[in-house]
Amino acid sequence: MPQITIGKGLSFYEEAQALPGVKRVAGMVKQDIELVTGVSPVGITSGQGSGCAVLYGTIGHSPMLDALEAQGKIALNAIRGKWECYSFQVIENPLAGIGTALVIAGNDKRGTIYGLFHLSELIGVSPLVNWNHVLPRHQDTVILDDRVNMVSRVPSVKYRGFFINDEWPAFGNWAKTHFGSMNAACYAPVFELLLRMKGNYLWPAMWNSNFSLDGPGLENAVLADELGVVMSTSHHEPCMRSGQEYSMVRGRGSIYGDAWDYIANPEGITRFWRDGLTRNKDFENVITLGMRGENDTAIMQHATLEENIQLIRNVLKTQNQLIREIINPDVRQVPRQIVFFSETEEFFYGSKETPGLIGDPELDGVTLMLSDNNHGSTRTLPSPEMRSHPGGYGMYYHMDMHGGPHSFEWVGATYLPKVWEEMTAAYEYGVREIWVTNIGDIGTQEFGLSYFLDLAYDIDVWGGQDAAITTQYTAQWVRRNFGAAFAPADLPRIEGIITDYTRLLARRKHEKMGENTY
């Protein structure tokens, strides 16, 4: 039985043709191995007499994988052409000078990255290793044999991620103190966290920051694209421009005009959208469509429902035409979303007297993002007649919320059985294209976020038959994140604290308590 020793003497085979983001993540995994064993793997570019090695590559970007497949030493057909899939194969004598190797092959960039991070998990490294400084248990060596051979699944949900929202003062002050601003140095650990959790999709912070300007310049977007993080913008920020950008460029004499008003200022607003699409067109994005008022407010607040629907219809026509001109004449090949949140939900469904946007040809191929009620209960799900919509459905879900009538933030209050109930139902009703959760400042939300993303990645495992699966999830999450620092006898107590704490907060959050509550 071939086996590979993770520890002293291990090498990482580094191809010149490897994708830059994959190389960067391989460096992170080498650091993980050093955390566990105390020894950092050596990077090699040939066999060089190495006994054991990790070989990694991406189909289409790896002569090494091509050669091994041609020689019959590895099989790639099980992952070829499959979104974000990877395989593990422990083999003997892959290259001259290498006795045994673990070959990590990815169908695409993220597949390879997930495979590399899966190696970290196999040796006991938590996805929170750097974000929360969760140190693994020391082991001199870890032996892996061909029992780790596997082919990963196609993720249950295509785009899985989170929204950094209402980020001041917590996330904002952290970014300012450690990095100076929400620049690429700040986003690097955020992207790492997302990818270690097998997410792939992000709505960046937007209260007083501009993702595509603060890198500085496009460095945030460049880094995201290098690492395979799919960027988008929140529900009220169309065409890859953050909500604060218009206030920076508006004014009398500005080419963008001085009114966030598509009726009064159509040329300026269209130019604003055009320039955003042009700026970010070379990156992997999901483009937000539609329009709300400034600062996430209702648009045309005193207009009729019919007038609002017609406005959004005209906006969609303009935005889709811009996408045809700038990105792809076949607009249906471009990932797009529209988020029906708050008052815009009525624009989609309409009323008995006024037809909504359901079935509008401008929404063909657009992912229709439904939402919860800001407090973790989904509002609507697709009917059987709606589920064939080209573009599919997504869900915008809240684990943190700043706004009326009651905010809840800065405390991780997510009760997993509630997430299970709402999101497994959403999946069963066909909401499978995008899952994104509002997690405020990220900090304190890691437990709920971990389950949300694991559920989105593999609903067959973490959806289970009923909510009892969340008890099993909590136990394994506690072992992974507290097992190195606490005695085994303490872990059930930690599980109980987390479960009871979140259960009680699900019944009554701090912000909703007053002198007359009881």
What are these regions (language model features)?
Residues 38, 135-146, 207, 215-226, ...:
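Gly/Pro-rich turn-and-neighbor structural signature
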Residues 128-179, 185-205, 391-394:
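An acidic-aromatic substrate-binding cleft motif
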Residues 160-164, 195, 201-204, 231-235, ...:
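Hydrophobic faces of well-ordered beta-strands that scaffold small-molecule active sites
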Residues 125, 148-151, 245, 319-518:
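Substrate-binding groove of N-acetylhexosamine-processing glycoside hydrolases
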Residues 19-21, 62-64, 110-112, 169-172, ...:
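Flexible loop/turn segments at secondary-structure boundaries
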Residues 13-20, 101-106, 165-184, 200-212, ...:
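The substrate-binding groove and active-site-proximal loops of carbohydrate-active enzymes
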Residues 1-153:
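Contiguous, structured surface segment used for ligand recognition
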